[in-house]
């Protein structure tokens, strides 16, 4: 799944009632989604492994654990979040992504996880669980992904709204983070490049989420293998 930029938690109102019916209807359409508090789990995990940079959670799935980042994308392919051998690996962020703060997050934050079942068993480990989103009812009932990074305030606890769920072949460069793979020093992708990723994801999406996303946003991409093709 791909999700658009993290939602800000809405402030509480002053307790006054709306003056018009229109204001009441507009207020009822607003939805406040509060990120679960994952900071303590993250803090305890990071004390055991400094490569841990975040905590990822999706309601009603086994996706609820630490996310690591190394100097390359191969170190944790067969290691768990504690650095111990594991066939299913762990959730790991692309080495090019930035997690210094919420404000400095990459325009496209990419997190990988294995699907090691050749039959695409959605009850498997790690990102095998993402296959639950192939079920439209489940997908519609679970529109959010929660991702928390290390930080000193609540802004590090983020809610991301899903705008696309798709299968793709490798000709779609949806995991691009920098302008140029060969010259990462040129910086991250432009708004136009991000918009191309967004449009490509929406065109391939299994469902129409009707979520507005622009090239000025930041997105979170969860990526795994599938044996569908």
Predicted regions located by residue number:
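Solvent-exposed, non-transmembrane regions of membrane-associated and secreted proteins
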Residues: 1-229
């Amino acid at each position: 799944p791909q999700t658009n930029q993290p939602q800000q938690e809405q402030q509480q109102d002053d307790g006054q009632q709306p003056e018009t019916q229109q204001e009441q209807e507009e207020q009822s359409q607003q939805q406040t989604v509060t990120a679960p508090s994952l900071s303590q789990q993250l803090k305890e995990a990071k004390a055991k492994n400094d490569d841990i940079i975040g905590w990822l959670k999706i309601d009603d799935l086994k996706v609820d654990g630490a996310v690591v980042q190394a100097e390359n994308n191969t170190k944790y392919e067969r290691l768990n979040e504690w650095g111990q051998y594991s066939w299913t690996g762990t959730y790991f962020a692309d080495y090019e992504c930035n997690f210094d703060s919420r404000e400095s997050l990459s325009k496209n934050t990419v997190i990988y996880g294995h699907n090691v079942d050749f039959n695409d068993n959605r009850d498997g480990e790690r990102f095998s669980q993402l296959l639950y989103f192939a079920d439209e009812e489940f997908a519609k009932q679970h529109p959010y992904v929660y991702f928390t990074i290390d930080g000193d305030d609540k802004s590090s606890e983020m809610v991301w709204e899903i705008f696309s769920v798709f299968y793709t072949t490798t000709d779609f460069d949806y995991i691009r983070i920098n302008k140029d793979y060969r010259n990462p020093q040129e910086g991250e992708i432009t708004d136009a490049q991000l918009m191309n990723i967004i449009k490509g994801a929406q065109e391939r999406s299994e469902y129409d989420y009707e979520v507005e996303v622009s090239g000025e946003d930041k997105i979170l991409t969860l990526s795994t293998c599938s044996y569908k093709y």
